[in-house]
Amino acid sequence: MSLLTEVETPIRNGWECRCSDSSDPLVIAASIIGILHLILWILDRLFFKCISRRLKYGLKRGPSTEGVPESMREEYRQEQQSAVDVDDGHFVNIELE
């Protein structure tokens, strides 16, 4: 039962729910939409980094190497790796007095 369709009223014995007819198609649709929204929100929180990276960069994994000779591919890989190696060794040390 959806929380949106329940009405709690204080009576002598405590709190009870007086719910409208649950076979109403609008109530069923609202319940399904609410459950789907909750599931999607949980998945978004769990996989936020993966999803945002996928949307930002798309499905591309790098430049296409189709039709490029293997020797040129290897040369390109070495250039990319050397560029990464240079970046990894470049740090700035700051000393506070």
Curated annotation (Swiss-Prot):
One of its GO terms (cellular component) is virion membrane. It holds the Pfam family Flu_M2. The record marks H37 as: Essential for channel activity, possibly by being protonated during channel activation, and by forming the channel gate and the selective filter. A lipid is attached at C50 (S-palmitoyl cysteine). The modification Phosphoserine is found at S64, S82. Residues 59-83 are annotated as: Disordered. It is found in: Virion membrane; Host apical cell membrane. Gene3D superfamilies: 6.10.250.1640. The record marks W41 as: Seems to be involved in pH gating. Keywords: Disulfide bond, Host cell membrane, Host membrane, Host-virus interaction, Hydrogen ion transport, Inhibition of host autophagy by virus, Ion channel, Ion transport, Lipoprotein, Membrane, Palmitate, Phosphoprotein, Signal-anchor, Transmembrane, Transmembrane helix, Transport, Viral ion channel, Virion. The M2 protein from most influenza A strains is inhibited by amantadine and rimantadine, resulting in viral uncoating incapacity. Emergence of amantadine-resistant variants is usually rapid. It comes from the Viruses. It is a single-pass type III membrane protein. The chain crosses the membrane at residues 23-43. Residues 1-22 are virion surface. One of its GO terms (biological process) is protein complex oligomerization. InterPro entries: Flu_M2. Residues 44-97 are intravirion. Cytoplasmic tail plays an important role in virion assembly and morphogenesis. Belongs to the influenza viruses matrix protein M2 family. Forms a proton-selective ion channel that is necessary for the efficient release of the viral genome during virus entry. After attaching to the cell surface, the virion enters the cell by endocytosis. Acidification of the endosome triggers M2 ion channel activity. Homotetramer; composed of two disulfide-linked dimers held together by non-covalent interactions. May interact with matrix protein 1. This is Matrix protein 2. It comes from Influenza A virus (strain A/Duck/England/1/1956 H11N6). The gene is M.
